[in-house]
Amino acid sequence: MKVTFEQLKAAFNRVLISRGVDSETADACAEMFARTTESGVYSHGVNRFPRFIQQLENGDIIPDAQPKRITSLGAIEQWDAQRSIGNLTAKKMMDRAIELAADHGIGLVALRNANHWMRGGSYGWQAAEKGYIGICWTNSIAVMPPWGAKECRIGTNPLIVAIPSTPITMVDMSMSMFSYGMLEVNRLAGRQLPVDGGFDDEGNLTKEPGVIEKNRRILPMGYWKGSGMSIVLDMIATLLSDGASVAEVTQDNSDEYGISQIFIAIEVDKLIDGPTRDAKLQRIMDYVTSAERADENQAIRLPGHEFTTLLAENRRNGITVDDSVWAKIQAL
């Protein structure tokens, strides 16, 4: 089905208000969920909203909490999210990293005691729109087996890198071949995954999203490489924030909350002039996209460039929402 941005935001806002969230906070949170969905990231927008409300009702998310600065070391700051709303706090933390970068050339904010930030790409994009390189990542509860294991012991720990090119170039990727959100998107659409995304119950690689969702044997990106990246990203976030690791979140908490996140902004213009920056970025993009195609019907893509097109299509034609997901939200 199709809905408008206004319908989507109003539905989110209604549910938040009914759960006791104050009107200003509810409006800002609903706006971010709706913008994420409008951008085409359904897995971490509308599809994720019922799970967000479940955690709100369970007390994992404290809607009136505000992040608090703990330590300041010039270009580096350490903050405590105090289990506040994840997407609103993440936006504030990237804004703070940008402020630090304006003064120092680079800004790094390490956040502990945080909640799920929904679409991580929003915060990299936020920096790139202002002319900064944006880098951020988060740890999570253990939802992926390390390479060679059957049991979940590491997080998908998504990493975002956004570049202020025209259009913005951005990688937003979990350390698994697919996020659990994308497994859900493909399952709801009745599709197999385009490539292997995990193991079935017999230990064979599979493209069946429902099987992987059930047995939790999701495949690390690049096999042992994604497994290793997940571990070191968790270590860095834990150390810089003095926060909880994947092991602590999984073993000590009843659900995924109290996680650790990193936000980095770099002011490119302190290092290179604008025309030179733009020319160098354009040459990279032209060189990549001018390669001979393996399939004449399949364009060579640059990461993140599709979001401009998706946003325009959704604004023109309405936002696609799965019927079952919309029914869940209406019932909340």
UniProtKB/Swiss-Prot annotation:
GO terms for cellular component: cytoplasm. It comes from the Bacteria. NAD(+) binds at residues 168-174, 224-225, 304-306. Its EC number is 1.1.1.130. GO terms for molecular function: 3-dehydro-L-gulonate 2-dehydrogenase activity; NAD+ binding; oxidoreductase activity, acting on the CH-OH group of donors, NAD or NADP as acceptor. Gene3D superfamilies: 1.10.1530.10, Hypothetical oxidoreductase yiak, domain 2, Hypothetical oxidoreductase yiak, domain 3. It is found in: Cytoplasm. Signal peptide: none annotated. Keywords: Cytoplasm, NAD, Oxidoreductase. It catalyses: 3-dehydro-L-gulonate + NAD(+) = 2,3-dioxo-L-gulonate + NADH + H(+); 3-dehydro-L-gulonate + NADP(+) = 2,3-dioxo-L-gulonate + NADPH + H(+). The active site is at 44 (proton donor). The enzyme is inhibited by tartrate and D-malate. Catalyzes the reduction of 2,3-diketo-L-gulonate in the presence of NADH, to form 3-keto-L-gulonate. NAD is bound in an unusual conformation, at the interface of a dimer of the enzyme. Homodimer. Belongs to the LDH2/MDH2 oxidoreductase family. DlgD subfamily. This is 2,3-diketo-L-gulonate reductase. It comes from Escherichia coli (strain K12). The gene is dlgD.
